[in-house]
């Protein structure tokens, strides 16, 4: 196909996200969360404002917001928490003027850690929203 379809069905955003190939972008910075939290602090909002400007200046980019957690808690709990982190991140980007159709969310819970040690320093690195892009 030519990629011009608009998707269909209630879950089209999820399906579209899985069909697209997302890659890392050095232009979009991760944000981090406190333990068991998904609300955005001032540092996160400042980073997201810069990410939003980049996305608005590149309107053809699609971004996948990946919610991640540390290893504490059950798998199911962390998948749900990661999803809340990704959604709160998307909500903020959209409030800054990013096209909501270009922002896709997914949760990896504790499945894709950035840091593999145990302990607060490492856990802090793993409690994050990570950004991948697709044209």
List the predicted regions and their residue ranges.
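A broad, low-specificity signal for short, low-complexity segments enriched in glycine/proline
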Residues: 23-27, 64-67, 91-94
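Periplasmic OmpA-like peptidoglycan-binding domain that tethers envelope proteins to the cell wall
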Residues: 68-135
């Amino acid at each position: 196909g030519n990629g011009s379809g608009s998707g269909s069905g209630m879950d089209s955003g999820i399906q579209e996200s899985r069909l697209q190939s997302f890659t890392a972008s050095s232009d979009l910075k991760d944000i981090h969360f406190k333990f068991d939290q998904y609300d955005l602090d001032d540092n996160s909002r400042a980073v997201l404002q810069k990410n939003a400007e980049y996305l608005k200046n590149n309107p053809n980019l699609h971004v996948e917001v990946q919610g991640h957690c540390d290893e504490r808690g059950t798998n199911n709990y962390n998948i749900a928490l990661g999803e809340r982190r990704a959604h709160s991140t998307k909500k903020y980007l959209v409030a800054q003027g990013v096209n909501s159709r270009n922002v896709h969310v997914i949760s990896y819970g504790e499945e894709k850690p950035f840091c593999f040690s145990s302990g607060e320093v490492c856990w802090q690195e793993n409690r994050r929203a990570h950004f991948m892009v697709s044209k």
